Regions:
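Active-site-proximal beta-strand/loop segments in catalytic clefts of secreted hydrolases
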Residues: 11-14, 64, 150, 155-156, ...
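Short, solvent-exposed loop/turn and secondary-structure capping segments
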Residues: 20-23, 93-97, 155, 164, ...
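Extracytoplasmic/periplasmic substrate-binding proteins
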Residues: 158-164, 175, 183-200
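Hinge/lid segment of periplasmic solute-binding proteins
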Residues: 56, 65, 91-147, 161-168
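Small-molecule pocket liners
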Residues: 148-151, 190
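Early extracytoplasmic/lumenal segment of secretory-pathway proteins
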Residues: 2-96
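Short hydrophobic/charged patches on amphipathic alpha-helices used for structural packing
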Residues: 71-72, 167-171
Length: 200
């Protein structure tokens, strides 16, 4: 192994990072010519990082099924550079002094490759700056990467906008085994209520 290689240990939700293991019929050809599902996002990131910064990075990737699984992994001694729990779990980890502050570079907008710092919603950044635990802002230890993402993703060649405009699509027999929801317990409860209530 090259001693100059940076090792980045990442743990996030199952199915959140594309591992490039799609079957041929699952790949998506975009108008741009890109093919989604052809490469692993991890391999693409490693290549991009070396091309951009001139240093090799090796991503060691693991997943968890629930926030509590991640918490158990951490309390049993697993160590990661980046974890992606829900807000209540990062708050618990922060309160229990289990997180390391983000680097000074994390919010550096002078780096044109710092896509998070440049592109983060001012609203989300403001919340993370204002909310505190133990007198320290959330933004010292965490960054919001998703906010209000509960919804329906659909293929317009198969489903109309009108059909996808209601949670009732989830219990419409016409779409049996053709639609799914985000693999998240809390979001699933919300979607189930939406599917059951006829006025939503």
């Amino acid at each position: 192994k090259d001693d100059d290689t940076i090792v980045l240990r990442v743990s996030t939700w199952e199915e959140y990072i594309d591992l490039g293991d799609w079957d041929e019929e699952e790949t998506i050809d975009l108008e741009s010519g890109d093919i989604i599902g052809e490469n692993s996002m991890i391999e693409d990131f490693e290549a991009w990082y070396e091309e951009t910064y001139g240093r090799k990075v090796k991503v060691e990737y693991s997943t968890f099924g629930t926030n509590e699984d991640l918490y158990n992994m951490l309390t049993l001694g697993d160590v990661y550079d980046l974890v992606c729990p829900s807000e209540y779990m990062f708050m618990k980890l922060m309160a229990e002094d289990m997180l390391v502050p983000l680097s000074d570079h994390f919010y550096d907008t002078s780096d044109p490759n710092n896509y998070y710092a440049i592109g983060v919603s001012p609203y989300i950044k403001g919340i993370f700056d204002a909310k505190t635990i133990g007198g320290e802002p959330w933004s010292k230890y965490a960054a919001g990467y998703m906010w209000g993402v509960t919804g329906i993703v659909y293929n317009p060649d198969v489903v109309t906008e009108e059909e996808a405009s209601t949670w009732k699509i989830l219990n419409n027999s016409k779409f049996k085994r053709q639609v799914t929801i985000k693999d998240n317990v809390r979001d699933s409860y919300f979607a189930a209520v939406g599917a059951i209530k006829s006025d939503l």
